[in-house]
Design a protein with these regions (language model features):
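Conserved hydrophobic packing residues within short motifs/helices of P-loop NTPase cores
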Residues: 5-7, 98, 125
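Beta-loop-alpha module in the N-terminal Rossmann-like domain of NAD(P)-dependent dehydrogenases
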Residues: 50-116
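N-terminal Rossmann-like dinucleotide-binding module
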Residues: 1-46, 69
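N-terminal Rossmann-like NAD(P) cofactor-binding subdomain of oxidoreductases
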Residues: 102, 121-123
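Short, conserved SAM-binding/catalytic segment
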Residues: 41-48, 112-120
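Short loop-beta-helix segment that forms the pyridoxal 5′-phosphate
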Residues: 50-51, 123-125
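Short, Asp-centered acidic motifs that coordinate Mg2+ and/or phosphate
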Residues: 29-30, 72-73, 123
């Protein structure tokens, strides 16, 4: 069983990611969205933590990591312009990424992701 986080829970595609996580026998530990999306979350993973501030999400992920509860994947369903920074955050923390399309908006961001994959050992799937 893999442990997931989700960034961007209120979007159109997020419920499909949540359904796929559940149907494949995995679990969602935490989610983040600037909009209150607890209703969406509760229909799939009522036990998951939920934050509306990225800083709180980061603090939770770091706390879990210190407790030996590292995440396996971050599913990114945030607005397109936030995909690159959210993937950068996950990769820097050694967490593999699943991202909705478009993956990035520029070739520079794509090159950066490749460098981060090599440097931190995590992958964009």
């Amino acid at each position: 069983m893999k442990k997931f986080a989700l960034i961007g829970a209120a979007g159109y595609i997020a419920p499909r990611h949540l359904k796929a996580i559940k149907e494949t026998g995995n679990t969602l530990a935490v989610a983040m969205d600037v909009n209150d999306s607890v209703g969406i979350m509760d229909s799939h993973f009522p036990e998951a933590e939920f934050f509306t501030e990225f800083e709180e999400f980061e603090a939770y992920v770091e706390d879990q990591k210190l407790k030996g509860e590292k995440l396996d994947y971050v599913a990114i369903c945030s607005p397109n312009y936030l995909h690159a920074p959210h993937m950068k955050y996950a990769l820097k923390n050694g967490i593999d990424v699943i991202c909705e399309k478009p993956l990035v908006l520029s070739s520079e961001d794509l090159n950066m992701l490749s460098e981060y994959e090599q440097q931190y050992g995590a992958k964009v799937n």
